[in-house]
Design a protein with these regions (language model features):
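Active-site neighborhoods and metal-handling regions in enzymes and metal-associated proteins
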Residues: 1-599
Length: 599
C-alpha cells in the first residue's frame, strides 16, 4: 500500500487498528522523554497528519480524525490540515472537548484505545483511563507508528555526548547528585528515575546534539543513595566524557536496556517518577517491580535548574552581550541591503543572523528555528519560512524576527519587530500597546508570594484596556546551555510557581491579527531581590538582553512618563554595554538607535 499522502497513511493506520483490535488510536506529540522539541525519528504526528507543531494530540477513529492544537497554532494548523478529513480542535476554546472526552465518546463498552507507551506520558494515560473507565473501555499499548512508518524515517539520533565543564556549569555532576539526593530525602524518597532530557542534562552536565536546536543526549538516569546509572548508547560517549562520568561515580549502561534493567532491580527503593514526564512504558515496569515503591511528584530538578546559580548567571550575561552584538550587526546589514534596493526574503534574514552568531567561537547551535515573518505572516506565532513558501520583504510594514542561539556559556531568545517603511495607524497603535505591555512587565515589582499567573496579568493589562489579548503565555523560562523553553516557571494564566531570584524568564507580549500583522517584543529578564521591609520581600526584574527597540513606530502620548523613562534608561544601558564591542561606524549607528525619546 502506498503511504505518500495523509489520506493513504490514515487508511493504513485504520487497517492496522482493525488488525490489532483497537477502535481508536492516539498519537501524541512526544518522544520517550516528554521533549518539547523532538528528534526527527519521533515526529510521527506530523507524518500521519501533516501538522508541524508542539503541544498537540492526534486521534483517529474508524470514521474520523481530530487534531488538538493550542492558540499559538490555530492559523498554522488550519492551513496544514486543509484538504484532509482532519478536524481541528482548538484547545481551550468554548465547546471544544478534551482529548480524553473525545476518546471516551468515540468508544463503546468493551472497546480499546491504542497508543504507544514509550511516547505517551503516564499522566496522559492516567487521565485517559479515568475517562474510559466510565464507558467500560480500556487502553491497549502497541506501537503502530513503528509498524507503519518504515520508509524514509530518520534514524534515532546518535551524536557525540560530552560534558559541559564545571567552569560553566558551576557544579560537578557528583555535587549535583548530592544536592538531588538531599532533595529526595526531604520528599520521602530514596531514588529517582530521570527521563526528561533537560533535567538529565543539567544534573550530569551532559550535552549532545540529538535534537535540532537543542544540545541534549537521548538518555535516562536512575539515581539511588549509592548509585547513578546513565542509560545511553555508550559508543557515542566521548572518551573524555566517559572518564568524567566515571570520576563522578556514574555508571554507564545501554539505552535500550533501561526497561530490562529497571525490571531486574532488587534493591528496595521508594522511587520518585513524575507522571507528567516519565513515559508509560517505564512507569509500568517500575510499578510492576515488587522491590520498588513508586511515588508521583514534581521533579525537584525542575526548581534546582530553574534557579540559575551564580556561575550560570555570570556566563549567561556574557553570552547575551555577544548575542546582542550579533543582533546589532544583523540589523545594520539588513537596513543597508534594503536601502540599496536588494531583494531580500524571510529566508535571507535567517542567513544573515546565522552568519553573525556562528562567527562566535562559543556558538553551538541556534536555540530554535528562526521565525522571520513579514507582514501578515507574523500573525502566525510560530511561522517558519521555507524555500517553497516565503515572503519578499517590502519597504513598508513590519518584519518580526524571533531568534536565539545556544553558546557554551548560555542560551538566548529575543524578538524584535522592525519597521521597514511606512506604517498604518493600526500598526503603530498595536506596536505602541505591545511595547507598553513589555515595559510594564519589565519594570514590575511584586511581593514574593505572588504566583506567575498573577505576574502574567501585568503584561496583559495594557492590551486588555483595548479589548485585545494574545493566545499564548507572556513568558517562559530559558535553560542554561539547553532548551529555549523549560520549567518550572512560566508567565501564563495557569502557572502557580512563585518567581525566585535567579530565575530567567522571557517578556514577550504581542498583538496578532490574522493575515494582517503580528507584533512581538521580547527580552529575557532575570528575577532579582528588590527589598525586605515590614510588608514582606519584594522582587523585580532586570534585563539580560540589550538590543535596541525600535522607537519610530511609537505613537506620541500613549506611553506614560515612567514607561518613557524605562525605555530611555534601557537604551542607555544598551549603548554602554555594546559600544565597547563595536567599531566606530557601528557605534554611530547604535547611538542613533538608542537616542532618548520625549513625551
Amino acid at each position: 500500500m502506498s503511504m505518500n499522502t495523509v489520506p493513504e497513511r490514515l487508511a493504513a493506520l485504520r487497517a492496522a487498528m482493525a488488525a490489532n483490535g483497537v477502535a481508536v488510536y492516539l498519537i501524541p506529540v512526544g518522544d520517550p522523554h516528554a521533549s518539547e522539541y523532538l528528534p526527527c525519528h519521533y515526529t510521527s504526528l506530523t507524518w500521519f497528519s501533516g501538522f508541524h507543531g508542539e503541544n498537540s494530540n492526534f486521534v483517529v477513529t474508524r470514521t474520523e480524525s481530530a487534531l488538538w492544537a493550542d492558540g499559538r497554532y490555530f492559523v498554522q494548523a488550519e492551513k496544514e490540515i486543509a484538504g484532509t478529513e482532519i478536524k481541528l480542535q482548538r484547545m481551550g476554546e468554548p465547546g471544544v472537548p478534551t482529548v480524553e472526552e473525545y476518546c471516551a465518546n468515540a468508544l463503546n463498552e468493551g472497546e480499546a484505545l491504542g497508543l504507544c507507551g514509550l511516547t505517551a506520558s503516564t499522566a496522559l494515560v492516567n487521565d485517559l483511563k479515568k475517562a474510559l473507565e466510565k464507558k467500560g473501555a480500556s487502553i491497549k499499548t502497541l506501537n503502530l507508528e513503528d509498524e507503519l512508518w518504515t520508509e524514509g524515517r530518520p534514524a534515532l539520533p546518535d551524536t557525540p555526548a560530552w560534558i559541559l565543564p564545571k567552569e560553566y556549569a558551576g557544579f560537578s555532576p557528583a555535587e549535583k547528585l548530592d544536592q538531588l539526593r538531599s532533595k529526595l530525602k526531604e520528599l520521602g524518597c530514596t531514588a529517582q528515575f530521570v527521563g526528561k532530557l533537560d533535567n538529565l542534562a543539567w544534573l550530569l552536565n551532559l550535552r549532545a546534539m540529538d535534537i535540532e536546536c537543542t544540545p541534549y543526549a537521548m538518555a535516562y538516569c536512575y539515581v539511588t543513595p549509592s548509585r547513578a546509572v546513565l542509560f545511553i548508547n555508550t559508543a557515542r560517549v566521548t572518551p573524555e566524557a566517559k572518564a568524567e562520568l566515571e570520576a563522578n561515580d556514574i555508571t554507564l549502561a545501554e539505552y535500550d536496556d533501561v526497561l530490562k534493567s529497571l525490571a531486574a532491580e532488587t534493591e528496595p527503593q521508594t522511587v520518585l517518577a513524575e507522571c507528567a514526564t516519565v513515559n508509560y512504558a517505564v512507569y509500568q515496569v517500575l510499578e510492576q517491580n515488587p522491590a520498588l515503591t513508586v511515588k508521583d511528584g514534581t521533579d525537584p530538578l525542575l526548581m534546582m535548574k530553574g534557579v540559575k546559580n551564580e556561575t550560570e548567571l555570570a556566563h549567561t550575561k556574557q553570552a547575551h552581550i555577544r548575542d546582542a552584538v550579533a543582533m546589532v550587526r544583523f540589523q545594520i546589514e539588513l537596513e543597508s541591503r534594503l536601502a540599496a534596493g536588494e531583494t531580500l526574503t524571510e529566508l535571507t534574514v535567517d542567513e544573515i543572523l546565522h552568519k553573525y552568531r556562528s562567527a562566535d567561537d562559543k556558538f553551538l547551535v541556534e536555540s530554535f528555528g528562526t521565525i522571520a515573518a513579514y507582514g501578515g505572516n507574523a500573525a502566525m506565532m510560530h511561522y517558519h519560512a521555507t524555500p517553497e513558501d516565503h515572503a519578499v520583504l517590502e519597504k513598508k510594514g513590519f518584519l518580526l524576527v524571533d531568534s536565539g542561539a545556544t553558546y557554551m556559556d548560555g542560551t538566548t531568545d529575543i524578538t524584535r519587530t522592525y519597521p521597514l517603511g511606512p506604517l498604518t495607524e493600526d500598526e503603530k497603535r498595536f506596536y505602541t500597546w505591545t511595547l507598553q505591555s513589555h515595559i510594564d512587565l519589565a519594570k514590575a515589582v511584586w511581593l514574593d508570594y505572588c504566583e506567575c499567573k498573577m505576574i502574567d496579568t501585568i503584561a496583559r493589562e495594557p492590551l486588555w484596556r483595548h479589548l485585545i489579548n494574545y493566545r499564548c503565555g507572556t513568558g517562559h523560562s530559558v535553560s542554561f546551555v539547553g532548551n529555549v523553553h523549560e520549567g518550572p516557571h512560566a508567565l501564563n494564566s495557569r502557572n502557580t510557581t512563585r518567581m525566585r531570584p535567579g530565575m530567567v524568564v522571557t517578556d514577550e507580549p504581542g498583538v496578532y491579527e490574522t493575515d494582517l500583522v503580528g507584533i512581538r517584543i521580547e527580552n529575557e529578564l532575570v528575577c532579582v531581590h528588590r527589598a525586605d521591609n515590614q510588608y514582606g520581600t519584594f522582587l523585580g526584574f532586570e534585563p539580560l538582553m540589550f538590543v535596541p527597540i525600535a522607537t519610530s513606530p511609537i505613537l506620541p502620548g500613549v506611553l506614560d512618563k515612567d514607561e518613557i523613562a524605562w525605555l530611555n534608561d534601557y537604551h542607555r544601558q544598551v549603548f554602554a554595554k555594546l559600544a565597547p564591542h563595536l567599531n566606530d561606524e557601528e557605534r554611530s549607528w547604535l547611538a542613533e538607535k538608542c537616542a532618548a525619546i520625549g513625551c
